[in-house]
Structures are given as structure tokens and as C-alpha cells.
């Protein structure tokens, strides 16, 4: 098995942040993208760029390398240029959010992938809140799609880690310690995290032995910064 970490959803949001951190750290990385041209424009020759569309299973079978150490799956319904349509119908949203993960898992099985799949999810899926109600309305059925894909991954037989993130923002990372717990939390403004900090957690969960077959919630705690050792210790505490 190689040390390569692949990111599916690598050209936007948290997936893009994860790719940049891997590249900046000099770690081998692969971006699975719908637009190879866009991927190469973003990453040049600093990372492997392979074509794969989560709504087209045959492309994932071609894309997945069984020697990858891990796959970080950050695919979501987004708006804007190149997005998949934030206000799309429920079936379209499910095809991307749930179907995309299912297609990825099945491609991994077909290819004999033995690494870990790290799934980005959200806090608040099991706890009622105004925030979740709004998000579930904007992205029709998000709650069910998210719960269903997590269950599918857990029952897949693959190694996994499911990371439930607080409300995302684009602030500079590294300015807060992180709260990492096994329990769910309501989707409220008091539980936020920068995409940069979340990307760091996703990368750690891809390789830390104690993150294997775990579900965790992560958001900012007090002002400060967790060293790599402190982050690893917080993940290890979940297994204690």
C-alpha cells in the first residue's frame, strides 16, 4: 500500500483545503475530479489528477487505485459555477450525496481497495435544531441522505472514519483548539470550524490507527492551537 491520500471533491471547499495541505506538506496526494483541466490548473504536477464523477460509477472504477492509503470523500451539493445545484430537486441531491458515496464504496470493493474511507458529514443529524431544519430545506432531504450514506459506509466492510463537522467558515485555521467527541451536537452557530481546521482533521483521520471505524464530531473549542501530537491524542481518546 502506498502513502497516497486521495480526495474526492478536491476542487472546492474543504476538499480543496485538504488537497492544498497535503501538497504543502509534501505528502503524496491524488485529486479525483470531474474536470481534469480544472484539477491540473489548481494542482499542476504537485499531485496526481484523475477523472472521476461520483454519479457515473464506471469512472470511479477506473479512478480508484487499490494501493491508495485512504480516500477522503467531501462531495456535496453546491451552487455557483461548477457546482451541482444547491437548490436541485431531492432526487438529484440524493444521487450526488448518497449515490455518490455508494458508487465510491462499490468501486473500492471492485478494485480491492484496502485503505480507509474518511467521510465528511455534519453535526446535528440526530438532534433537532433550527439550523438543521433550514439546511434540510435548502438541500432537500440532506438529513436522510447524510444518515443513509453513513450507514452504508459502516456496513460496507471497508475501513472508515465519519467526521461530523460543525458549521463551516472560511476563516484562517490554526487559531483554536478543537473539540473532538463521539457524540452528536445540534447544528448551531456556537459550534463552528474553519474549513482549514476541518481539512487537517480529515487528513489525520485518514492515517491515525485510532480513527479506524470511528464516528466523531469536531468544532472549535477555546482559542489556541492543537499540535499534531495533541490532535492525535484527542483522536486516541475516542478509543479509550
Which residue ranges define each predicted feature?
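Structural motif
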Residues: 4, 69-72, 116
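Core catalytic loop region at the nicotinamide-binding pocket of NAD(P)H-dependent oxidoreductases
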Residues: 205-231
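Glycine-/Pro-rich loop/turn segments that contact NAD(P) or position catalytic residues
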Residues: 77-180
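NAD(P)H-dependent oxidoreductase Rossmann-fold/reductase module
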Residues: 168-171, 176-186, 191, 226-240
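Conserved beta-strand positions in the Rossmann-like core of class I SAM-dependent methyltransferases
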Residues: 6, 30-31, 161
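N-terminal Rossmann NAD(P)H-binding glycine-rich loop of SDR-like oxidoreductase domains
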Residues: 3-27
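NAD(P)H-binding glycine-rich loop region in Rossmannoid oxidoreductase-like domains
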Residues: 10, 31-111, 210
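Substrate-positioning beta->alpha
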Residues: 145, 163, 187-204, 214
